[in-house]
């Protein structure tokens, strides 16, 4: 029984296909596009049209950017703007502020 990605079998089915190695699935191509290995323009030049996938890739990359920001804040602490914002938010209490200053009258 031939292997799943046998060279002879794939060459006889599609002579213009990539003969060496495995042929990437749509899911793999999506991942590689997201990671920057391919560009939609270069794939279109080769004859691969993934216009319907482009929207999904854009949405997924935006989600990854927001995840990366929160991950960076967790790993490396807050950014300078975040630290400044937290520093400026001092809520008064009955016995003064959190910093110990007398309450404003």
Curated annotation (Swiss-Prot):
Keyword Nucleus attached: yes
Cellular component aspect of the GO annotation: nucleolus; nucleus
GO biological process entries: ribosomal large subunit biogenesis
Entry keywords, A to Z: Nucleus
Main subcellular location: nucleus
Compositional bias of kind Basic residues: 1-11
Region feature (Disordered): 1-20
Superkingdom per UniProt: Eukaryota
Family of this protein: Belongs to the ALB1 family.
Protein known as: Uncharacterized protein C2D10.19c
Organism: Schizosaccharomyces pombe (strain 972 / ATCC 24843)
